[in-house]
Regions:
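Single conserved hydrophobic/aromatic residue that forms the stacking wall/gate
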Residues: 1-10, 414-422
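RNA/tRNA-interacting regions in translation and RNA-turnover enzymes
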Residues: 3-363, 368-370
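Polar, glycine-rich mid-to-C-terminal structural blocks
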Residues: 354-359, 366-416
């Protein structure tokens, strides 16, 4: 019980409380552009601006604090295969003070189920959820060479991850290396020997873009499903790599007393061409089923950051933003137009003609009759899972799943006839 002599201000400092509303959004795997607060805001801005017929500005996070004083020489970035690593950016930040994060960062992380650790780790997590770009920080003083290599090893190696577990690397694992010493499983999990600790004063901050297939293979092989791998597996925006790094660095300068002492290193071998699609206005009407005014179509496309080129009476050339990996065809563009226009605005005839075909599969008919007869006699039907645990499988030639969800469902269940024949 607090003394009555304590003022209200002190009580508020002791009992800090706030209310919040958390929205959980179920995303399909193809909507990698919306796996961030900024990405969701971008979509909401488009829908609300169109449906409310008013312009809403989308405000990007501030990087006004970003500035560097070049003291330290840059590290060399060596990417062995541009398919595996399309872009790699980095900064060296000095005078870091490891401490608790400010309340606004801790509150944001707690709200989305992430436990705050320290200001550096928290800022990388904060920016990842804010912008959708995973980041990783290394202790610069533990990097012994002047070259960061992004490569796969041809020979097996041992690697200790942040959780203290020693893992066997395969030749499919893409690694971030201190010359030839592995520091991190790229896009998935960091290493213990180069991690940030309470004694860290200088960090190398990484922002990169990795091949989704490569990341998924390693993630499933090592059973490491992280927030970082979740995003890389679905595809991360190449154009956002540098901005996210600057955003994190600006927060580190502001809240960790950091000082950037290098150039922004940017190795970009995997540049991609713009996607251009021709949109036929007649096809919009045919596919949707009713006519949408051309001015409304253009408004929707502009709100979605689709650049409109070469407009004629019957068609328009569309340039798709790089962060929209799911839009590759004309029908995808039409789907986006309808999504923002509103599925609820689809005009439906009042009369619906529904035809139900008669039952023609006689096998099912007799099976149902027999089932009804047997159940009336007190029999019970058993529908077994087609998967069982390895211990329960009595067959010597058991078929084992390579990546089962559980040890209890790791083998295919043989029928009694198949088991007898084998």
């Amino acid at each position: 019980v607090l003394s009555r002599g304590l003022g209200d201000v002190y009580k508020r400092q002791v009992f800090k409380s706030y209310s919040d509303k958390i929205f959980e959004i179920g995303l399909t795997p193809n909507r990698c552009d919306a796996i961030s607060h900024f990405g969701v805001s971008r979509d909401l801005r488009a829908a609300i601006s169109y449906r409310k017929d008013k312009q809403i500005d989308l405000i990007s996070p501030s990087i006004s604090n970003f500035h560097n004083t070049i003291i330290s020489p840059n590290l060399n970035i060596d990417i062995s295969d541009s398919k595996d690593c399309r872009r790699f950016c980095g900064l060296i930040i000095n005078n870091i003070e490891i401490k608790d994060s400010p309340d606004f960062i801790k509150n944001r992380l707690n709200a989305i189920g992430i436990n705050p650790i320290n200001n550096i780790v928290d800022i990388t997590n904060y920016v990842m959820h804010e912008l959708g770009q995973p980041l990783h920080a290394y202790d610069r003083n533990k990097i012994k060479s002047n070259t960061i290599k992004i490569q796969k090893f041809s020979n097996p190696k041992k690697f200790i991850t942040l959780d203290g577990e020693e893992r066997d690397l395969t030749n499919d694992d893409l690694m971030i290396c201190d010359d030839n010493t592995p520091m991190c499983i790229a896009g998935i999990y960091g290493g213990l020997n180069h991690s940030v600790t309470d004694d860290t004063t200088t960090i190398f901050l990484e922002s990169a873009n990795f091949d989704p297939v490569t990341i998924r293979k390693s993630s499933k092989h090592h059973l490491l499903n992280t927030d970082s791998s979740y995003r890389f597996e679905r595809g991360v925006d190449l154009d956002n790599t540098e901005f996210a790094l600057k955003r994190a660095a600006a927060l580190i300068i502001e809240h960790c007393n950091g000082e950037i002492i290098s150039d922004l290193m940017d190795e970009y071998p995997g540049k991609i061409d713009e996607k251009n699609i021709v949109l036929n206005f007649n096809n919009v009407d045919k596919l949707i089923g009713f006519k949408i005014d051309k001015l409304k179509i253009k408004s929707i496309l502009n709100l979605l950051d689709f650049k409109i080129n070469n407009v004629t009476d019957i068609s328009a050339g569309i340039t798709i933003p790089n962060y929209r990996h799911d839009v590759n065809r004309e029908c995808d563009v039409i789907e986006e137009i309808l999504r923002i226009h509103g599925y609820n605005n689809i005009e439906i005839d009042k009369k619906l003609n529904i035809s139900i075909s008669s039952l023609t599969n006689f096998n099912n008919k007799y099976q149902n009759l027999i089932s009804d007869y047997l159940s009336s006699l007190g029999f019970n039907e058993i529908m077994n899972n087609s998967l069982v645990g390895e211990k329960l499988s009595q067959n010597d030639n058991k078929v084992i799943l390579l990546n089962s969800l559980s040890s209890d469902i790791s083998c295919l269940l043989y029928t009694s006839d198949a088991a007898d024949e084998s």
